[in-house]
Amino acid sequence: TTFVAGFVGTSNLLRGQVARTIVGDGGTFTVRPEKIRIADPEARPAGDEIAASGRIRQVVYLGPDTRYHVALDAGGELVVTQQNFATSSMEALAQQGRAVRLIWKRQHNFPVGDGG
């Protein structure tokens, strides 16, 4: 359920028209922040992937990870968490305002019920 998705750590929810635009179904879906990758705006997803265009609204550098809040062109927002293998805090923070395409494997997109 959406309650469980929110209760078990950070999770992104795609609902209604936003889900219909991105996933092709108007239900409610969840995708974990660490399963999403940030790509250039012109990047094309593979056949087993889902993509959403947007703009990085906020960057939170957390030492080993960076959390990106991305405002979606379709509406809503997704949070993406990336490990900082070779990214400095200044490089991460400089991404704010950048247009991006978010891409994730279809298998990481889970339908959830709206019950509590």
Where are these predicted regions, by residue range?
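Non-catalytic connector elements of ABC transporters
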Residues: 11-13, 20-116
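Conserved beta-strand-loop-alpha-helix hinge in the C-terminal portion
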Residues: 1-8
